[in-house]
Structure formats: structure tokens, C-alpha cells
Amino acid sequence: MFFTISRKNMSQKLSLLLLVFGLIWGLMLLHYTFQQPRHQSSVKLREQILDLSKRYVKALAEENKNTVDVENGASMAGYADLKRTIAVLLDDILQRLVKLENKVDYIVVNGSAANTTNGTSGNLVPVTTNKRTNVSGSIR
């Protein structure tokens, strides 16, 4: 009889301890969630990129206006610089798209392997390999 009373008491103490621990954990999680600085949204980042690109193009145009048409090489240098900048940006976008595509393929393959409720056997989604191409080497 003593053991049954002791077990109830221990069970209540353990449940109270777990409840307090869960409450503290939840409060700490909320605290750290709201204390962390907010990440900039993709819309704001896109606007910043477009603004910086416009400034860069304006600066190149003004630089070309300031150079008198003594020689055609100055305007071609600005054009080549702009072309290189665009090539670097496109290469970065391509690399990010390849990474994103690989992540999506990984999720699709793992999701279809885990979903066996439809009765089909085997993996119907083809596993893609790394499709990364070196674009920066081909653009000059």
C-alpha cells in the first residue's frame, strides 16, 4: 500500500517537473524566436539588387559621357565590363538554381520512396545527377 501511494506521488512530481520543463522550454523558444533579427524578405532584396543595378548602369553611362569620343575603346571597355558583370550574375543565378533543383529532386525521390500507399513497387521518379555546368568559362 505504501508503494502505491509513493508511485502516485512520484508520478505527480514527474508530471509536474515535465510540465515546468516544457513551459520553460516553450518560453525560451519564443524568446529566442522574437529576439533574433528579422531576415530581409526576398522582395526587399530584389528591390535592392535592382536599385544597385540601375545605379551601376547610370554610373557606366555617365562615365562614357564624360569620356570624349576621342577613341571608341572607352565605350567598348564599359560594355565589356557590363557584360562581365552580367555573366557573373547569371552564373551565380545558375548555381543557385542547380542547388535548388538538386534539393527538390532529393525531396521528390525521398518522398516517393517513403510513400508506399499506392501499391506500386520501386521508385518511379528518376534520380538526377548533378547537372552543374561551367557557364563562366564560356562567357567572356
Curated annotation (Swiss-Prot):
Glycans are attached at N110, N134. The keyword Secreted applies. It is found in: Secreted. The lineage of its organism: Eukaryota, Metazoa, Chordata, Craniata, Vertebrata. Keywords: Glycoprotein, Secreted, Signal. One of its GO terms (cellular component) is extracellular region. Its main location: secreted. Coiled coil: none annotated. Residues 1-26 form the signal peptide. This is Coiled-coil domain-containing protein 126. Residues 120-140 are annotated as: Disordered.
